[in-house]
Amino acid sequence: MPVPWTLAAAADLEHIKDYLTEHYPHLMQSTVLELYETIRFLKASPHRGRLGHEEGTRELIFSRLPYIAAYRIKDQTIEVLHIYHAAQLR
């Protein structure tokens, strides 16, 4: 099952990278890798995330990171919509 990212999700990741590079450069690479790897596991378990705030979406909570990935399952595709910091208002 493919897991494409929307342009908005890709932009979210770029903002996360920029923030981490500026404030926590020693954590940037490992954090981004963990985000990618955890999202990749949705292929095997697409319903792993909780029901999302918007109808038809789900939210993947990262156990060791303060981020949430919003996604939707559409046909045979899992589409990553956004990545939020857990403290961020949506």
Ranges and model annotations:
Residues M1-P2, R90:
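Absolute protein N-terminus
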Residues Y67-I68, R72-R90:
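Enriched for short, Lys/Arg-rich terminal
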Residues R50-L51, F62, Y71:
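Sterically constrained small-residue positions within well-ordered secondary structures
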Residues T57-I61:
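A beta-hairpin/wing motif
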Residues E54, R64-L65:
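Structural motif corresponding to alpha-helix initiation and N-cap regions
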Residues A11, F62-R64:
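Short coil/turn motifs at beta-sheet boundaries
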Residues P2-G56, T77:
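Basic, Lys/Arg-enriched alpha-helical interface segments
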Residues F41-L42, S63, I83:
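Conserved catalytic core of Hanks-type protein kinase domains
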